[in-house]
């Protein structure tokens, strides 16, 4: 992965932590950047696992969207976060092919202590 992308991911993770605080439990990079088969047009796929209900997650969606827009405009990169409840993800990881794929190919960028 290019150093510039690693640097942006580190910055992005810091901003995500500010948005979600202690509710953020794990951040997983998946997709082309995790597999190493990215191109110059690739977006950055990120799974954010939180301890919030879907209704509670809605309260954070505007801040998350604004952050994504900022990265697109300022750095010409698409950060594509998907936010899921951690327990839901764990419970259904074996049954949902998408979740299985994230677990299989994903690179953990952050894990709460």
Please tell me what each predicted stretch does.
Residues 44-49:
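Short beta-strand->loop micro-motif that forms the acidic, two-metal-ion catalytic signature
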């Amino acid at each position: 992965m290019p150093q510039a992308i690693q640097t942006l991911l580190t910055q992005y993770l810091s901003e995500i932590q500010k948005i979600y605080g202690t509710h953020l439990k794990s951040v997983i990079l998946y997709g082309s950047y995790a597999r190493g088969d990215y191109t110059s047009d690739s977006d950055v796929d990120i799974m954010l696992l939180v301890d919030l209900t879907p209704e509670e997650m809605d309260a954070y969606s505007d801040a998350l969207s604004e952050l994504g827009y900022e990265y697109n405009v300022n750095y010409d990169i698409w950060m594509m976060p998907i936010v899921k409840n951690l327990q839901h993800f764990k419970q259904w990881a074996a049954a949902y092919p998408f979740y299985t794929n994230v677990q299989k190919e994903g690179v953990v960028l952050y894990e709460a202590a």
